[in-house]
Amino acid sequence: MKTFTAKPETVKRDWYVVDADGKTLGRLATEIARRLRGKHKAEYTPHVDTGDYIIVLNAEKVAVTGHKRTDKVYYRHTGHVGGIKQATFEEMIARSPERVIEIAVKGMLPKGPLGRAMYRKLKVYAGAEHNHAAQQPQVLDI
């Protein structure tokens, strides 16, 4: 018997919608990353993108535990000398709530071309509306 290897052209990808309202950021991000990679499927193959599309709604209502709302700091660099910028979790949620979930999930995906392809299947929205009704996404309860 030969070992099964998934082929990119035969992978069936489903669309799922997840409501982030009241969910803990890290626990939500790990399950999203797992499904983007395709590890929940029997035909998972490490070197093939077998994951599904994930739509995340209500990113502005995601929860964190402890004092992370005020103490957690996100760093980024402009590329210029002395150009390090920082923002707390509260500031990030106020400015662009989608980025909080995107950063958390991206850090859990593989680094490289395959990881970037998986990341492109993540769609995050601050509110409860999305424009992917044509894909008929199924509700995923995490």
From Swiss-Prot:
GO function terms (MF aspect): mRNA binding; structural constituent of ribosome
Xref: InterPro entries: Ribosomal_uL13, Ribosomal_uL13_bac-type, Ribosomal_uL13_CS, Ribosomal_uL13_sf
Record-level GO BP terms: negative regulation of translation; translation
Keywords annotated in UniProt: Ribonucleoprotein, Ribosomal protein
Keyword Protein biosynthesis (UniProt): no
Classification via CDD domains: Ribosomal_L13
Biological role stated in the UniProt entry: This protein is one of the early assembly proteins of the 50S ribosomal subunit, although it is not seen to bind rRNA by itself. It is important during the early stages of 50S assembly.
Protein name listed in UniProt: Large ribosomal subunit protein uL13
Lineage summary: Bacteria, Pseudomonadati, Pseudomonadota, Gammaproteobacteria, Enterobacterales
Gene responsible for this protein: rplM
